[in-house]
Amino acid sequence: MRNVLLGILKSYSHKAILQARSQLSLTQAQMADRLSMDTRSYVYLEHGETCCSTLTLALFLIYCCPDPVKFLKELRTAFQTTRKAAA
């Protein structure tokens, strides 16, 4: 179950990060700077090749996400739906 939830987080955060960068009109390097990571690591994250760390997720929610509450509510719904389906 943990790997399934991690996959949901990876997919959901990847889409939200792409959308936020577009809304903020930032380059990949600028977005990486806001998330305190190097550009190469950010590119991997943006392409969904890696999952964000707890620190990266927190920085994203604080400095980049246009609506952190909405992000977390939708992520919670996705997690709950997955858990119910597995039960």
How would you label these PLM feature ranges?
Residues 15-31, 59, 84-85:
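Short basic helix-loop element that most often maps to the first helix and adjoining turn
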Residues 25-44:
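Short alpha-helical DNA-recognition segment
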Residues 1-23:
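A short, Lys/Arg-rich alpha-helix, primarily the initiator
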Residues 11-12, 50-52:
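Short acidic alpha-helix initiation/capping motifs at coil-to-helix transition points
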Residues 53-73:
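DNA major-groove recognition helix of helix-turn-helix/homeodomain DNA-binding modules
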Residues 5-7, 44, 51, 69-87:
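Short, charged recognition helix plus adjacent turn
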